[in-house]
Regions:
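Short, surface-exposed loop or secondary-structure junction motifs
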Residues: 1-189
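Short C-terminal domain-edge/linker segments immediately following a structured domain
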Residues: 25-31, 202-203, 213-214
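Non-catalytic surface loops within mature trypsin-like serine protease
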Residues: 84, 175, 199, 211-213, ...
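Short acidic, gly/pro-rich beta-turn/loop elements at beta-sheet edges
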Residues: 163, 181, 205, 215-217
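Short, well-ordered beta-strand elements
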Residues: 183, 194-211
Length: 227
């Protein structure tokens, strides 16, 4: 996330096209290419951008000649036994046992969250606590090729000026009570998640919430501190 590419979700939102308005994969890609300007010179700073992941997913599909969800299932989910994890691109697909996502709070009232965007490299993966713990164990005992993939994901990736970048290759690294944490959060209308690993004490905390007002980042760290 040091490419400088503007976030296509923000570009669409600024253009009046919110997540509740139907969109096709081609619409998302068009939003990426319409803007010819970078936010900054590549490699000069960090700024999270969903565009990076959308384009990476498209590259995987082009090279593998497979749908991204099928590629992930064949290469990662099935070999690891992550039977409750999938990437379903079509929002109309019924996902068994998926919790309904909600917006609002007790004071203003709760309502079902909705979105109309297709799912791709930028997000929309559905999983379970148990499956994410399987994924966490893979970091300690890699069984997929290449075996050094977990190490590659957390390898230092400094900025062009030499300053450290806490965001590595799809994982964020940071401190907690003197220990290094590795993980990533996720959000989509009505859903919030946090995947937090503390390798130094062999601890993984997974928080999956189906209410937008919950803060999994804080919850995960509170649990880790008390563990």
């Amino acid at each position: 996330n040091s490419s400088g590419l503007p976030d296509f979700l923000e570009l669409l939102r600024l253009g009046g096209h919110g997540l509740d308005k139907p969109a096709r994969p081609s619409d998302l890609m068009a939003a990426c290419v319409r803007n010819r300007h970078l936010n900054f010179a590549p490699g000069s700073r960090f700024l999270y951008s969903n565009t990076n992941f959308l384009l990476l997913g498209a590259i995987v599909e082009r090279v593998s000649r497979m749908k991204l969800g099928d590629f992930l299932a064949e290469r990662i989910f099935k070999p690891l036994g992550m039977s409750h994890t999938a990437l379903e691109p079509e929002i109309a697909t019924i996902i068994p046992d998926l919790a309904t996502g909600y917006l609002g709070d007790a004071e203003t009232g709760f309502r079902r969250a909705g979105h109309a965007y297709p799912q791709g490299g930028e997000g929309g993966l559905t999983s379970s606590v148990e499956d994410l713990l399987i994924w966490s164990r893979h970091f300690d005992r890699p069984s997929l090729e290449p075996n050094d993939l977990p190490a590659q994901l957390v390898a230092p990736h400094p900025l062009a000026d030499g300053h450290a970048n806490h965001y590595r290759r799809g994982l964020a690294v940071g401190p907690l009570r003197g220990l290094q944490t590795v993980g990533h959060g996720g959000l989509w209308p009505g859903y919030r998640t946090e995947f937090l690993r503390i390798p130094g004490v062999d601890l993984t905390v997974v928080v999956i919430a189906n209410l937008a007002t919950i803060n999994p980042w804080r919850l995960a760290r509170a649990v880790a501190v008390e563990a």
